[in-house]
């Protein structure tokens, strides 16, 4: 059984349809990279998966449970939405850390609010996550004392603290200087080695090619092409994919 199944996802903003019947599946432990030009629907897809936006049509199924059905508006109460979001962790382009909290406090905040674990257990797991992203020596620092790359790694640890089924990244390196990009991509590569299921919207073609199990190219609200990195990057079938990759290679 697939960990994620998306069927017929359609989303519009006014007269502009930004997702036009999106269909795909993801297996546990797979990494899916989503590439494409701005305005293709990539970020909107992530926002729909995370219940930050609601599609008009389609279904989202996680581990066999339908967590979203465009035809059923009865399950959009705040409590239901919060529960749906637990399936997905989302790391944004901007780090969105709470500036008044330390690294440890940022990572432990959501689990403490959930109230399902003891304080000791939350602290222990947070320290393990902070170590996992290579920031043990910064655990008591505040965001203003960290580099952009370090802040993004804290954001990754914070997302992992909720134990999501699927970890989503929306252009995780786009706000970083080139020299800081590598440290964030290294963390994501480490997560892959631990069989973390991930969806990564990225403009880093080398990363998408080397780390992904699947690559999705989106254009104008549709999946123009999807397959293994070898198939998409070396033998693209769509003319739009070919044009996008040719342009990306020139940059």
Residue map of PLM features:
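A short, proline-enriched helix->beta-strand linker immediately N-terminal to the Walker B motif
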Residues: 161-165
């Amino acid at each position: 059984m697939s960990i994620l199944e998306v069927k017929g996802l359609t989303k519009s903003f006014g007269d502009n349809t930004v997702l036009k019947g999106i269909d795909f599946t993801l297996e546990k432990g797979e990494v899916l990279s989503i590439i494409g030009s701005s305005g293709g629907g990539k970020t909107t897809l992530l926002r729909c998966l995370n219940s930050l936006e609601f599609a008009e049509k389609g279904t989202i199924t996680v581990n066999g449970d339908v967590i979203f059905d465009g035809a059923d508006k009865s399950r959009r109460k705040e409590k239901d939405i919060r529960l749906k979001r637990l399936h997905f962790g989302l790391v944004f382009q901007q780090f969105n850390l709470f500036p008044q909290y330390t690294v440890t406090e940022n990572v432990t905040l959501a689990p403490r609010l959930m109230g399902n674990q003891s304080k000791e257990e939350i602290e222990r797991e947070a320290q393990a996550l902070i170590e996992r992203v290579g920031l043990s020596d910064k655990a008591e620092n505040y965001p203003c004392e960290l580099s952009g790359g370090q802040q993004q790694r804290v954001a990754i640890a914070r997302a992992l603290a909720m134990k999501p089924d699927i970890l989503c990244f929306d252009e995780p390196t786009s706000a970083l200087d080139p020299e800081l990009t590598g440290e964030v991509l290294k963390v994501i590569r480490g997560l892959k080695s631990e069989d973390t299921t991930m969806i990564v919207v990225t403009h880093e073609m080398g990363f998408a090619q080397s780390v992904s199990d699947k690559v999705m190219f989106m254009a104008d609200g549709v999946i123009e092409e999807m397959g293994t990195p070898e198939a998409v990057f070396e033998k693209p079938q769509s003319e739009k994919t070919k044009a996008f990759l040719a342009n990306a290679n020139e940059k």
